Amino acid sequence: GFDRLVALAVVQRSSTRPAILMLTMMGITAFLSMWMSNTAAVAIILPIALAILEKIPNSGKGHRAFSRAMVLGVAYCGTIGGIGSAIGTPANMLAMTFLSEFTGTELVFVDWFKYGLPVVLVMVPLIWLYLLLTFGVRKLDVDLGEAIRSEAGTRLTLTRAQKIIGVIFVIVVLLWLTETLHGIDAEIVALAGALALFFFGTIKAGDLNRINW
């Protein structure tokens, strides 16, 4: 889908150094997790990470250590990223509701970034450093260029449906971020985005049956 292509495009432009590639994969996972379920974000990135790892010549202990660090990093950041935005995880919406009902603090979509995004920006590098030290990834000297190009090089063509999804996603996010300017509730914006996907034929009524409600 569109999200996978975005991830591949970023990975293709990443450094070929193992430590930096791992940080890139963790950052992408955290970012995606801000806009979708934590599990879905990990499910998108983990196959890409595993495909790259499989193409690396097996250098024994160092290869296994890097593989473990990469998988754990993606999994950790799938959870951490959900803290970043109001829709990242249902717990955030519950927190906003309780803050409104019990403390009188009204938070709009963009307000949550003040509380959630700093946590993500601090935690992702800390987890990365922890994994580097624990598994010794810094000592691994492997050129990942060919593995990255092999996984990402031929898969970056957007279909019409993916372009539509990308445009609608950007518009919805921009409307969420500017809620204080136009006054349209985040729920209305989300519903309008979903209806737009139906209008352009990107999703069909039958697709609703495959959603894990």
Locate the predicted segments by residue.
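Membrane-embedded alpha-helical segments and adjacent helix-loop junctions characteristic
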Residues: 1-61, 209-213
